[in-house]
A protein has these predicted regions:
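Positively charged n-region of N-terminal signal peptides that target proteins for export
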Residues: 1-5, 9-12
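C-terminal motif of bacterial Sec signal peptides marking the signal peptidase cleavage site
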Residues: 16-20
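Soluble, non-membrane globular domain cores that form compact, hydrophobic packing
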Residues: 21-95, 101-176
Length: 176
């Protein structure tokens, strides 16, 4: 009887041990900033004034050409919504894009595709050579700016403002 009880206890301990070892600790993803993307963009600009004349627009995710042109994404299958803020003067290479993904697990994948796919010379006569992508939860930020505008704004300053809006933590930052 004692052997049977000991066998059951040992098997129970082994099952618990195997179950605990089988579950890998997943990296906890932050909860992204809440609210409309345009409101998040406004909050970023409250933290870092660019001194540029800017316009913020919600992107039509069904228009794949506009999506690719502005975000570098070839399709919107992982995206819930997107907004862009750009200088009204086309000779100023500045663009801030926020994308909210459907599932925060896909944020870094979307961010990498944005980094690899965005055209930093989309303005033709100027190039945004200072580029960073950052993510917090389900929100991905891409900011690109011409380095000759560094006395006004840099991608690092916008990423830091986004970090502050996101509660002080970012899940990742990518750059070229």
């Amino acid at each position: 009887m004692l052997k049977r009880i000991m066998s059951i206890l040992i098997m129970g301990i082994m099952v618990i041990g195997m179950t605990a070892c089988g579950k890998a600790a997943e990296k906890e993803v932050s909860k992204g900033p809440e609210g409309e993307l345009s409101a998040i963009i406004d909050q970023i600009y409250e933290k870092k004034n660019t001194d540029l004349m800017l316009e913020t627009t919600k992107l039509d995710l069904t228009d794949t050409e506009i999506l690719k042109y502005n975000t570098g994404l070839s399709d919107a299958s992982l995206v819930k919504e997107a907004a862009i803020s750009e200088a009204l003067i086309s000779s100023q290479a500045y663009s801030l894009i926020l994308v909210r993904v459907k599932d925060s697990k896909d944020a870094k994948t979307v961010a990498q595709e944005m980094l690899d796919g965005v055209n930093q010379s989309k303005w033709i006569c100027v190039t945004a050579d200072d580029l960073k992508v950052a993510g917090c939860g389900d929100v991905v930020l891409l900011v690109m700016v011409a380095s000759n505008m560094s006395d006004t704004v840099t991608s690092e300053q916008i990423v830091e403002a986004f970090k502050a809006v996101a509660g002080g933590n970012l899940d990742f930052t990518l750059e070229k």
